Regions:
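N-terminal active-site beta-alpha-beta segment that forms phosphate/nucleotide-binding
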Residues: 1-107
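Long, contiguous hydrophobic alpha-helical segments, chiefly transmembrane helices and signal peptides
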Residues: 94, 115-116
Length: 173
């Protein structure tokens, strides 16, 4: 089940050494470079624990605008412009913005998505709240409704190699 996969992979990720996290994060930064270089408005996540250290992108690309998610009620998620001075610790252990100034997700060129697991058909397992699934569904629906008038943001999921698995049981959100 998804819950078993989630539990096992979080346990495995939590056992990684800091050196392994840094080495793997460096490798992932290199792989992201061509996409980040071309983008202006980039949504990242605020990594926590042993997740890929994606917030390094902020210092690597000071000329880019980075946006971070803020979780609201009803599986809703909006984006704030990243500002180090506005960060507050969320009850689940990650940082989010204290600001109530939200930006339209249509400005995003690149969305970097975390996961506990991905499979080869783009299914993902997150922490179980459904926030990213709802957010990404809305973006993809907006793209369909707007026809070809605008470019779709590129969506890239990041994880360690052991988090890429053959099959994730999919659910409709």
């Amino acid at each position: 089940t998804k819950n078993e996969i989630r539990k096992n992979l979080i346990l495995k990720r939590n056992q990684l050494s800091k050196e392994t996290v840094q080495k793997n994060s460096n490798y992932i930064m290199e792989k992201l470079h061509p996409y980040v270089r071309e983008a202006e408005n980039i949504m990242i996540f605020m990594n926590m624990g042993n997740e890929v250290e994606i917030t390094r992108l902020i210092t690597l690309y000071p000329d880019k605008k980075f946006y971070i998610p803020k979780t609201l009620s009803d599986r809703n998620m909006k984006i704030n412009l990243y500002d180090e001075n506005e960060l507050i610790l969320h009850k689940f252990g990650y940082y989010e913005s204290s600001s109530d100034i939200f930006y339209d997700e249509k400005i995003l060129d690149l969305i970097i998505v975390p996961a506990v697991a991905f499979d080869y058909t783009k299914n993902r397992i997150g922490f179980g709240g459904g926030y990213y699934d709802t957010f990404l569904s809305r973006i993809l629906l907006n793209d369909q409704n707007n026809g070809k008038n605008r470019n779709k943001p590129m969506i890239i999921g990041v994880c360690y190699d052991f988090q890429l698995i053959d099959y994730i049981p999919s659910e409709v959100h």
